[in-house]
Amino acid sequence: DADRLAIVDEKGEPLGEEYTIVIAADGYLDELQQSEKFVINLSSSLALEKLAEQKNSTVLRSAVGEINVVKKMNEINSNIGGEGNGGVILRECHLGRDSLVAVTLILNRMSQSTDKLSEIYSSLPQFKIVKDKVNVDNINSEEIIKKATSLFENAEKNTIDGVKFTWDDRWVHLRKSNTEPIMRIYAEAP
């Protein structure tokens, strides 16, 4: 349904779906020339937060799902948001993920300099993310989350959607799927 965008650079290298919103935001902030509030979900990359810090902007997190991102955008009157799945939401167009909006924002960023897409990407904060899932058909996923919470006592915890453990430059997010008998596990670090 053309709501997400995956990017490939001029060398044929995929940049990763997590960086669609980051590159779009980079150009958006440079064009705007003022601070902005972004909304992304809990499972999205830290790269946007680190970029926002560099550009005097903020990032707020929502539960996973387009509807949750949009609700948070409305709550804080944010103009731009998205998810680390290639989805970008721009209020001035409409409050839904849209790959054509993402394409426009990416092309806007590319037009702001003579840098190649690979150079734009490499200038951004770099993180590696792992996304996995575990079958929990006969396992109490709440018990898994409870046990994990006791293991990571030194981390900041967010429980709006499963549990996310965050340190300065890394995080782990555990959440039960709403559609399958699985637990999704996401982790990111430099």
Regions found by a protein language model. Name each.
Residues P14-S35, A63-G65:
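Short, acidic/small-residue loops that bind anionic groups at enzyme active sites
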